[in-house]
Regions:
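Extracytosolic ligand-binding ectodomains
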Residues: 2-415
Length: 415
């Protein structure tokens, strides 16, 4: 370039560059020009013994994502779901979590069902200081700065259910569960509590995840004739268990079963008549009578089919996405450190009622419900907490150190 008098060539160059940059910015900001999407990872089992319970959660996440995108996404960035099948295998799910974080560049993870799966994924999430929304009730005795627990803590599900059963059905009880950390730890808490309340444990049996042979367990229940059974089986084993009870003539009116992992989706899969008259405890039932829930159920059925049902883990998955979207939209925070701070200040009106993220535990304040299964596949609510319950992942009547020592002393089972 020929030098102009007074050094004007430099000024001309600066002006030219500035105009070019401004043109690029204006071009990028033109109406209709899409901003880059923002990815989230979804980790659920679409195959294997857990598929019947977990696959519907992907649809709940999808509904929340579609609703968020319809209202502008995250400040103009559309949310993109990247779904990985965990194959009912905790170790494999951890590998997929690593892939989603390091290769796909997702901003948050939504998923896991069993505690074995969550505990396998947890070190991956913590190693990367990432973020997991875990949507299922669980045994407690855990906190992580990198996990938002949208399912129930023990004092929001299994503890009120066990106490209600003891008060209403009798003091003699039997425990059955899948052989991994959730049933073992949940029953550790229950035995400790019910013993203090004068309860009498008649028997306790654990079966491999996915087990179908229930003969020995049902024979023992028939012989012991407990006032109630507390059931922490998971996955397809529940269908085999209730079929075996029915075949043995063990009925809900004489020996009611209280389940922690059977909801509307499982009733539809295993046959509505099998569990009619038995009980379950959750933080959400599709039959909840409030305007927010009725609208939620209608939107879901319009999107995925009138025959579909909703349950607690699905609603908790939906709520998890809603919490993340609201936090991410706040001051355009997709930075994980800042996002986590915003999340601990979130309160949200949801289909289950008002929920709030507890600053100290990263669990949700939420109500507890006990439902009695009906022949139409829904639950009649027979008890509910008066207010949202403060989450206590470590039940208050022992110290965290005592609980962890008791848990570590359990027999070697799946993590």
């Amino acid at each position: 370039m020929q030098k102009l008098p007074g050094g004007k060539s430099s000024l001309l160059f600066v002006i030219t560059v500035a105009v070019a940059v401004l043109a690029g910015v204006l071009l990028y900001a033109q109406p209709g020009r899409a901003k880059p999407s923002i990815k989230i990872g979804v980790l659920h089992s679409l195959t294997g013994t857990m598929a019947s319970s977990e696959a519907p959660l992907v649809d709940a996440v999808r509904l929340a994502v579609e609703e968020a995108n319809a209202s502008g996404g995250v400040n103009g960035r559309m949310i993109e779901m990247v779904v990985e099948d965990c194959r009912s295998d905790a170790a494999y799910c951890a590998q997929q979590a690593e892939k989603l974080i390091t290769r796909e560049g997702v901003h948050a993870l939504f998923g896991c069902w069993t505690s074995a799966c969550r505990k396998a994924v947890k070190p991956v999430v913590e190693k990367h200081h990432h973020l997991l929304f875990y949507p299922v009730q669980y045994e407690g005795l855990e906190q992580s700065p990198d996990i938002i627990y949208t399912g129930a803590a023990p004092n929001q599900q299994i503890i009120p259910m066990a106490l209600w059963a003891l008060q209403r059905k009798g003091k003699r009880f039997y425990l059955i569960g899948s052989d991994y950390i959730f049933p073992r730890t949940a029953n550790l808490i229950v035995k400790d509590l019910l013993h203090a309340q004068g309860g009498q444990l008649l028997g306790e049996r654990y079966l491999p995840l996915g087990a179908s042979d229930m003969a020995a367990a049902v024979k023992e229940i028939a012989a012991q004739r407990p006032d109630f059974v507390l059931n922490t089986l998971n996955g397809d084993s529940n269908q085999h268990f209730f079929r075996a009870l029915q075949a043995a003539g063990i009925t809900a009116d004489k020996t009611p079963v209280f389940s922690t992992s059977i909801a509307e989706v499982e009733l539809a899969t295993m046959g509505r008549d099998l569990m009619a008259g038995h009980y379950a405890a959750w933080g959400y039932f599709q039959s909840l009578d409030n305007a927010e829930n009725k609208a939620f159920v209608e939107r879901f059925k319009q999107r995925f089919g009138r025959e579909r049902v909703l349950d607690d883990p699905m609603e908790a998955s939906y709520v998890g996405v809603k919490l993340w979207v609201e936090a991410a939209r706040s001051q355009d925070q997709t930075d994980l450190v800042l996002l986590k701070i915003v999340l601990t200040q979130q309160t949200l009106r949801t289909p289950q009622g008002i929920v709030a993220v507890d600053y100290d535990t990263q669990h949700l304040w939420k109500k507890a419900y006990i439902g009695k299964a009906r022949v139409d596949g829904q639950f009649e609510i027979v008890w509910q907490s008066a207010q949202p319950i403060h989450p206590a992942p470590f039940p208050f009547y022992r110290s965290p150190a005592e609980w962890l020592a008791m848990q570590q002393a359990l027999p070697e089972v799946l993590p």
